[in-house]
Amino acid sequence: MKPATTSWADEVNADYVDGLPPSKEIIDGDYKHITQYKFNDEGKKIKVVRSFKVERKIVSRAVAKRRTWTKFGDSRQDMPGPNSYTTKVADDILMNYIGSKDFEHAHDHLDGNKPMAKCRICNGDHWSVKCPYKGTSMDIESKAIAAATAAAVGDTNKSGKYVPPFLKDGAKGRERDDSCAVRISNLSESMTEDDLEELVKKIGPFTKMYLAREKTSGLCKGFAYVHFKYRKDAAEAVEVLNGHGYDHLILSVEWSKPQN
């Protein structure tokens, strides 16, 4: 469908209440043509024709619902979509400009003559794998000192001294706590993090969540994990959401099983 052409003289001579003809919108395939009339700074009537290419993409339900809100203020008579005269789409970007002196002061700690590598065997300015003393008595002595240090750390539990959490129980460290985590499965491919947050935030506060996605397409794999702050909220999520209908699918919610 091609945009309908009208006589400019007819449009100018037409009698309108506000002095301006109404806006027109014509859709031609994947393109949308919008014709608007306004007065310029000199008080002359001008005609503005804008063409848009219509693209379809999947957005979260919160964004789709927000687009159906009734416009107000200066945009109450605008058509769907943002108006550049009343709407600012971009985010504010704060920039901090620094002078040449500040830039030099920020890079004073970078010494070009300082070696980037340090050998753990002889403390030289080279990597340990390229040390000329590798395999000699000096190398064996450094390994013995490292083993003695590790043994001393292991004995701190008996002496009552503080041990960092990452050194407790050997190299195993602390295991992940899944006592308040639930697994939500049978999710649709269009599920997003915003939709998942909208689904669980009414039950109770949560510390983190994970939505499994395909690496290539970025679509949801069909399951997600939510770690609640309190176990009672996790139990309520299992009771309320299990068997709950969401996006034309029946959700399956269960306790997260600990990793072996």
Swiss-Prot record:
Residues 180-258 form the RRM domain. Pfam families: eIF3g (PF12353), RRM_1 (PF00076). One of its GO terms (cellular component) is eukaryotic 48S preinitiation complex. One of its GO terms (biological process) is formation of cytoplasmic translation initiation complex. It comes from the Eukaryota. It is found in: Cytoplasm. InterPro entries: eIF3_g, eIF3g_N, eIF3G_RRM, Nucleotide-bd_a/b_plait_sf, RBD_domain_sf, RRM_dom. GO terms for molecular function: RNA binding; translation initiation factor activity. Keywords: Cytoplasm, Initiation factor, Protein biosynthesis, RNA-binding. PANTHER family: EUKARYOTIC TRANSLATION INITIATION FACTOR 3 SUBUNIT G. HAMAP family: eIF3g. Component of the eukaryotic translation initiation factor 3 (eIF-3) complex. The eIF-3 complex interacts with pix. RNA-binding component of the eukaryotic translation initiation factor 3 (eIF-3) complex, which is involved in protein synthesis of a specialized repertoire of mRNAs and, together with other initiation factors, stimulates binding of mRNA and methionyl-tRNAi to the 40S ribosome. The eIF-3 complex specifically targets and initiates translation of a subset of mRNAs involved in cell proliferation. This subunit can bind 18S rRNA. Belongs to the eIF-3 subunit G family. This is Eukaryotic translation initiation factor 3 subunit G-2. It comes from Drosophila grimshawi (Hawaiian fruit fly). The gene is eIF3g2.
